Every structure is written in C-alpha cells, then in structure tokens.
Amino acid sequence: MKDGYDLTERFNRAFQVYYGGRAAEVAAAYREFVHSMPLAGITISGIFLSHSLPGDSDLPSFDAGIVRRTLTDADYQRNGSVYKMVWGRSQSEQTLATLSKFWWADVFICGHQAQESGYGRLGKNMLILDSSHNHGVLLPLVLEKQYTMDDLVQALVPLAGVE
C-alpha cells in the first residue's frame, strides 16, 4: 500500500490494460528480468551496495547467504530473504554491525528510504541515497578506493547540477 492504493493491484491491472491477451506472457518476461538482477554488490574496499537491507525485526530469520547462492522462489515470497532485503527499513546500528560481519562490509550504500535532502546517514556506516526528487543525489565511486562516511558524503553530487 502506498498513499492508500494497492500498488501490486495497480501494477497487475496495468498489464491487462496495456498488454491485453499477452499480459501473462509480458508479466513472465518482467519477472524473469527482475529475477536476473543482482541483489547487491560489494567493492574490494568493503562498500556494500544494495537497494535496501533487512530491518531489525527481519534479521533473526534472514538468510545472509542469499548474496552467494542460487535464489529460490521461496526467497522472493513475502517472508523470504530477498523480500526482506529489498523491502527492509529501520535498521539499527546492531543490525548493521551484524550484516557487516556477514558480508565483510565496512560501509553500506542503499536507497529505498525517503531522504528530503537527497541523502541521509544511518548509524556510523550506512549512507542512504534518494534520487526520486529535485534534491536527489548521485555518488561517483572509485571501486578500489577506501572511503570514510565523511568522504562519501563529500563526494555526493546533486542531480540538479548534472548536465
């Protein structure tokens, strides 16, 4: 639900409107495409990049091995680890510390959580980027370079300034 609307229902209805009799075929192609996307990446310097991370309440049943194994249909279900990683919010410093140990990550860069100024810091090692509005930012990285959180914040570029 977002703004009182079931987005899944709207999405499915749009497939029927735009693709008619081919809706199921196109939906299957979308599903295959989305399932082919990587869940995360990690740089040699320990920067973990993902859409989101599991929230505090999801961590006890979360399988951190999903980034290193073949995913199953169960992983994508509402109680599955992919779902928890993609839709997670409200990570505490303890959750970030636990995930950092799982994945040998020093810093997390994620999105998924609205940030009025285009970015926000969560704890000492998570940077949240939001490019969905006119204060959005991007973050150029040198993948083998070691960064502090302050370095990352200093490197942010406002999207409004990109030509």
Regions found by a protein language model. Name each.
Residues 1-163:
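Feature recognizes metal-dependent phosphohydrolase scaffolds
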